[in-house]
UniProtKB/Swiss-Prot annotation:
Record GO biological process: arginyl-tRNA aminoacylation; glycyl-tRNA aminoacylation
Family: Belongs to the class-II aminoacyl-tRNA synthetase family.
Catalysed reactions, semicolon-separated: tRNA(Gly) + glycine + ATP = glycyl-tRNA(Gly) + AMP + diphosphate
EC number(s) given by UniProt: 6.1.1.14
UniProt keyword annotations, A-Z: Aminoacyl-tRNA synthetase, ATP-binding, Cytoplasm, Ligase, Nucleotide-binding, Protein biosynthesis
Native species: Pectobacterium carotovorum subsp. carotovorum (strain PC1)
GO molecular function, one term: arginine-tRNA ligase activity
Cellular compartments annotated: Cytoplasm
GO cellular component: cytosol
Subunit structure, interactors included: Tetramer of two alpha and two beta subunits.
Protein name: Glycine--tRNA ligase beta subunit
Tagged with keyword Transmembrane: no
Predominant place of localization: cytoplasm
Amino acid sequence: MTDKTFLVEIGTEELPPKALRNLAESFAANFTAELDAANLAHGEVSWFAAPRRLALKVARLSASQPDREVEKRGPAIAQAFDAEGKTTKAAEGWARGCGITVEQAERLTTDKGEWLLYRAHAKGEQAQALLAGMISTALSKLPIPKLMRWSDKETQFVRPVHTVTMLLGDELIPGQVLGIHSARTLRGHRFMGEAEFTIDSADQYPQILLERGKVVADYDARKAKIKADAEEAARKIGGNADLSDSLLEEVTSLVEWPVVLTAKFEEKFLAVPSEALVYTMKGDQKYFPVYDNSGNLLPNFIFVANIESKDPQQIISGNEKVVRPRLADAEFFFNTDRKKRLEDHLPRLETVLFQQQLGTLRDKTDRIQALAGWVAGQIGADVNHATRAGLLSKCDLMTNMVFEFTDTQGVMGMHYARHDGEAEDVAVALNEQYQPRFAGDELPSSAVACALAIADKMDTLAGIFGIGQHPKGDKDPFALRRAALGVLRIIVEKRLPLDLQTLTEEAVRLYGAKLTNANVVDDVIEFMLGRFRAWYQEEGHSVDTIQAVLARRPTRPADFDARVKAVSHFRSLDAAAALAAANKRVSNILAKSTDTLNESVNAAVLKDAAEITLATHLVVLRDKLTPLFAEGRYQEALVELASLREPVDAFFDQVMVMAEDEQVRVNRLTLLSQLRELFLQVADISVLQ
């Protein structure tokens, strides 16, 4: 039988748009794994996804599994027959399981003994008989956080299922998936094309759906069309569309037949901060904002309809009518909020709980104010501006605008601060206090903003760890991992002279007696060092490089960064492997030794030429390295230390460290200890693999 194209389509009610791509990709990956596990040869597995369907198309699927030779070893001959040569129950049970008698079994003889053996030629199963079960298994493994039941069925899925189509070439595969019998019926667009029609062959998909059903099943093709049409629509009105990938993905998942249209709103709304308008357009309505070449918001937006209308202006007008009240709300909130100064909202912060054991948002504000001032003093920022920014940092949370449009927190604080006449770096700090919000996000731009951002995040870390609510597994309700990484990124990338030890101690001190975890400082630092590990692994540094630095537990992030980069460079040197091995050997020798070492090497006790040479090199190097260590020039220091390869190799080749003479032995151990201490000034390179 020849290989054929296999198609499966699961027709559903509207699937969650933000999960659609992940569902489709997982379906394809799961089914591919099932095919491989079943030893069914196949070509490319393509996935399709639209709001009301998930589908897979497999090229060149084998009609059956290959035949195979089956061997099952039974009991040893000694256990298969008793002393009289009669078959035992063990042998009979094994033979019965194989579908034969003991007499029909073969013998397997090796140098370890002799066993009963069943050998047979197993014919591969037909793909038809396997596919429905494999599809069901693949679907059962989809990442669905919440399943639904529908009708009177016991079956559960992410959304109710109405059709299942499984075709191998032009042959319908019988069977049930999710309680639905396989059929040739496909459902088209809700309002265009044919509501239902039949498909004759798997090779007709997805073209038949496009032509008869008016559904673009190819997700990436649909996304590309939306992107291209939106860019062209923006160009026609002299602008550039904000086609953020997350919104583009969501819109792609909402439509089956994308039609891109352009609409407008009243120019008077442009007096409202653009962030509030964009929040409404993107977040609520799934519209694409349009900007001019200078980055200013235009009074237009682009949206995607799910239907091709004879009167597109009617659809455009409808969307304009929908968005106008939301923009009017934003205008009203903006004008109303500006009747009060930001600081007038401070008393209301006392009515909002930050965390039951840690007090109100006003309590948090007071701590942030003090900590931001402290951080500013450490990094050379304006202390007065930092403390002022700390005082105002949460006031915008009490405004009408932020209450209604929550994602505008921070940015509205900036606009209101400017209206109140606050210093510009105070206003900017209010906007940037939450940065970085996600991996790759921009950092705060000014020193005052950095001080506020660090203070806000460290207050949360100290408080939540201080009451023992550490992140567990995937659960991190206070986003502590993001907060820790944000602090580290700011300190490292801005090269700030902050130490996690003193920073955490200050954050903890400001809580007074509220915290119950006596180990809170150490817990926070260990947690942050753990985030360092994850960050640098993502950056491409090897695990053992990071472990080598973590062994020294450096608590200044900028210093940690310099050490990691130095060790990564050291690994590229020819001497690295030998010196890492030597350090490991030295570490083991010193760990096993019970001798008390001297404070310094006694040159008069040195006997062998190799130990004298090594000691001389260490003296010379120590003078060179002292200023390098002091200035954090670790890469240069390790390059200098790489010159020790030959004297270290010679020492281990020619010198007996554990000499019988105690004075000689202790002197040599002291020499090795000093060698290791020089490397440990940077990292523990003995852990390098």
